[in-house]
């Protein structure tokens, strides 16, 4: 920052200290006689240095902080510091040594000596080189008068570079350090001409020396005055620079504060925006919550109103109940006052309830018996229809047989005999039809009587219920009166008791009459049917035997064709309908009957089904009068075993069969075959009670086991108690149900009348053994010949008979 200038043109002994902010110039005269002036100058110099030291420290502190300077201050400082070159040239041209002080800067300009004393510029550097070489520096010697330039002391540190000064000059921006540019002028001493003179000058006169001394003393005084002025101005300048630095520091601080404030404002703006968004969301949420709260408030208010209304209603009901309770207590007190106890009333009520339960049970039993009677009547009617169809079929068969006979194929005697037999058969058939019609009329009459009796019983029940209600109303009205309370209770009890007794007695008589009438009718009907069909069976048997003995080849071939066709038809139907069972006929009678009617059934039924396509539909009867598995099972078990039970399940029946066979037979090896056979009679896990009786199914299972060869050879009666075992398990019933008073034993095949019947029975025994009892609509199993003999024994609706 500081610069040292030494000019060879100046011959006076000057010491110029160029400092920023002030220029301290010391001028020594040539004569050097005045030591006081020298000491004064040195003291001033030392004091100036002491003053400048703290200023330098402050400048160093300010430069360490790198304070920016405003462009306006720099431009002002440069204007004050720069000195135009024209002044410098004027200084060189001036010949006077009068000191001048410029207003622009604190620079002292001294007037130069005369022009002839001014040395040339070439000699000045030589003299300048000699000056530092002299050890004894004498300010008063005129011969050695010269400028001596000392190194100026810098107030600011040397950290600032020339690049910064050049950049500050060219740019308007603030620089980190304050720089002052001082104008360097050549100070021309008065003794330039003398210093430029040769080494050995001529001695001057004393007047000139005195004049020079006076001039040098005045010059020293001017220099001292200029120094004092410069020091004062420098001190003021230093003080001004410090204030400028402080202002610059304040400016930097204010700028930093402005930046911080701007950043804070931006951050606060962002925060305010986020807070505004949060407030908006909070407002919307609060509005939603407010609406929900209002809706909840309304709902709660409505619910509260509803609860209040319900509470008021309950309070009213409670008040009414309390009033009623008070009245009842008052009545109890009144009754206790009369001397009666509540225990007797409770006992009477209990007895009345028990009696009512008994009457209800009796009524229920009576209704069940009535239903069973009605079902039996329907069964009888269906049996009659069945027998009528059978007689019609027999009539058709006889007509066909009579039409087939030709006079050419037989002898006259045979034809006459056959015609007579046919006529007799026709007559008997006519008689049988008449009897059947008569029995039909009787059954219709009995059914009408039964319906009338049923209507009468229903009317009586309605009347008795009305009487009971009237008695109850009378008892209630009498209970209200305090005096006749117990009398009314007794009267109602007696009325109910008497009415129940009369009702039971009347219905018992009706039931007895109905049972006796049914018994008589069934006996008469069974006797008449048995006699007619037994006689008809014998006659047909003799006719068939005689026909087979005749040597008629055509007739034999026709019968053979009919047999083969019937056999094929039966095999196909048995394969197709293997899970349907045979009719409900006792097994022994069925086997015995098969020996007598096998051939006749084959001949007649095959021809009948050929001529009549609706033959299968004529024999599809629902003999039970029930619908559904549960209803049929209940009806069957109640009628046969007098027990109510659910339908039989396949899993339970299989477990029962396994248990029985493990007890009876060791190592039974036909489990799978037996299960397949049993599963044919079960649908969806239950027995088909609506298609077949369970007792027939048990008999069929028993027959299936008895027909196994390995158990047939050893002992025929291995599975004889199977039915009892099953009935005991399901119904706690030891005896198997009987369908007639006498169940004929199974006749052996050796007891047949002739070997032909034995062969036919053996031939068709296995095929017709497992034909179903009940048939679905639209199905047939090949057995078109119904059982012609009806055996009636125990009535199924009451186990007493």
From Swiss-Prot:
It is a single-pass type II membrane protein. The chain crosses the membrane at residues 222-242. Residues 243-801 are lumenal. Residues 168-177 have a biased composition (Low complexity). The keyword Membrane applies. Residues 84-95 have a biased composition (Basic and acidic residues). Residues 178-187, 468-481, 762-780 have a biased composition (Basic residues). Residues 135-153, 400-409 have a biased composition (Polar residues). One of its GO terms (biological process) is positive regulation of transcription by RNA polymerase II. May be involved in the regulation of Rho-mediated signaling pathways and in cell cycle regulation. This is Cell cycle progression protein 1. It comes from Gallus gallus (Chicken).
């Amino acid at each position: 920052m500081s610069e040292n200038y030494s000019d060879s043109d100046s011959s006076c002994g000057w010491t110029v200290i160029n400092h920023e902010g002030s220029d301290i110039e010391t001028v020594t005269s040539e004569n050097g006689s005045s030591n006081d002036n020298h000491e004064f100058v040195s003291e001033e110099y030392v004091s100036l240095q002491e003053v400048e030291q703290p200023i330098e420290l402050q400048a160093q502190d300010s430069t360490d902080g790198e304070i920016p300077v405003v462009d306006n201050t720099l431009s002002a400082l440069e204007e004050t510091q720069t000195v135009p070159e024209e002044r410098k040239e004027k200084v060189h041209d001036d010949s006077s040594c009068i000191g001048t002080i410029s207003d622009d800067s604190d620079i002292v300009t001294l007037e130069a000596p005369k022009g002839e004393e001014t040395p040339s510029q070439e000699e000045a550097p030589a003299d300048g080189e000699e000056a530092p070489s002299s050890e004894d520096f004498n300010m008063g010697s005129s011969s050695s008068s010269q400028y001596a330039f000392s190194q100026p002391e810098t107030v600011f540190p040397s950290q600032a570079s020339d690049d910064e000064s050049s950049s500050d000059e060219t740019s308007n921006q603030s620089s980190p350090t304050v720089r002052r540019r001082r104008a360097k002028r050549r100070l021309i001493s008065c003794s330039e001409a003398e210093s430029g003179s040769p080494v050995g000058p001529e001695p001057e006169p004393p007047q000139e020396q005195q004049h020079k001394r006076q001039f040098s003393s005045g010059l020293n005084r001017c220099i001292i005055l200029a120094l004092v002025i410069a020091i004062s101005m420098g001190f003021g300048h230093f003080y001004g620079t410090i204030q400028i630095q402080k202002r610059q520091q304040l400016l930097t601080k204010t700028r930093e504060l402005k930046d911080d404030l701007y950043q804070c404002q931006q951050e606060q703006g962002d925060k305010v925006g986020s807070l505004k968004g949060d407030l908006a969301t909070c407002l919307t949420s609060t509005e939603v919550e407010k609406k929900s709260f209002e809706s909840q408030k309304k709902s709660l208010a409505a619910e509260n109103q509803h609860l209040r209304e319900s509470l008021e209603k309950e309070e009213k009901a409670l008040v009414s109940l309390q009033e009623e309770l008070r009245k009842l207590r008052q009545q109890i007190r009144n009754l206790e006052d009369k001397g009666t106890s509540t225990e007797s009333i409770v006992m009477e009520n209990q007895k009345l309830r028990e009696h009512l339960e008994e009457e209800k049970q009796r009524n229920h039993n009576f209704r069940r018996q009535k239903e069973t009677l009605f079902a039996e009547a329907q069964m009888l009617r269906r049996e009659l229809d069945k027998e009528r169809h059978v007689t019609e079929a027999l009539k058709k068969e006889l007509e066909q047989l009579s039409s087939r006979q030709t006079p050419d194929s037989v002898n006259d005697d045979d034809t006459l005999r056959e015609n007579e037999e046919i006529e007799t058969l026709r007559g008997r058939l006519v008689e049988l039809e008449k009897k059947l019609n008569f029995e039909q009329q009787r059954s219709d009459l009995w059914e009408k009587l039964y319906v009338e009796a049923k209507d009468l019983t229903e009317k009586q029940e309605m009347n008795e219920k009305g009487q009971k209600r009237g008695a109850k109303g009378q008892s209630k009205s009498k209970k209200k009166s305090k005096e006749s309370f117990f009398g009314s209770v007794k009267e109602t009890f007696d009325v109910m008791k008497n009415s129940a007794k009369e009702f039971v007695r009347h219905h018992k008589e009706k039931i007895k009459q109905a049972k006796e009438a049914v018994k008589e009718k069934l006996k008469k009907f069974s006797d008449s049917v048995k006699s007619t069909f037994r006689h008809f069976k014998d006659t047909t048997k003799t006719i068939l035997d005689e026909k087979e003995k005749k040597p008629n080849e055509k007739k034999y071939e026709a019968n053979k064709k009919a047999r083969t066709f019937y056999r094929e038809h039966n095999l196909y139907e048995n394969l197709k309908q293997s899970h349907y069972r045979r009719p409900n006929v006792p097994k022994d009678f069925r086997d015995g009957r098969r020996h007598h009617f096998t051939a006749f059934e084959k001949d007649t039924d095959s021809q009948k089904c050929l001529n009549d396509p609706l033959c299968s539909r004529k024999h599809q009867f629902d003999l039970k009068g029930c619908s559904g598995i549960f209803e049929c099972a209940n009806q069957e078990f109640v009628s046969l075993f007098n027990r109510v039970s659910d339908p039989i399940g396949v899993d339970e029946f299989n477990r029962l069969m396994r248990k029985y066979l493990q007890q009876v037979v060791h190592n039974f090896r036909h489990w799978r075959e037996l299960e397949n056979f049993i599963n044919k009679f079960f649908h969806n896990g239950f027995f088909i009670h609506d298609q077949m009786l369970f007792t027939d199914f048990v008999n069929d299972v028993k027959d299936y086991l008895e027909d196994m060869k390995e158990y047939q050879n050893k002992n025929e009666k291995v599975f004889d108690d199977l039915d009892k075992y099953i009935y005991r398990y399901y119904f706690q019933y030891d005896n198997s149900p009987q369908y007639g008073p006498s169940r004929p034993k199974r006749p052996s095949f050796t007891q047949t009348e002739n070997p032909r019947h034995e062969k036919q029975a053996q031939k068709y025994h296995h095929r017709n053994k497992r034909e179903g009892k009940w048939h679905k609509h639209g199905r047939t199993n090949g057995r078109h010949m119904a059982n012609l003999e009806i055996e009636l024994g125990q009535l199924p609706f009451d186990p007493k008979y």
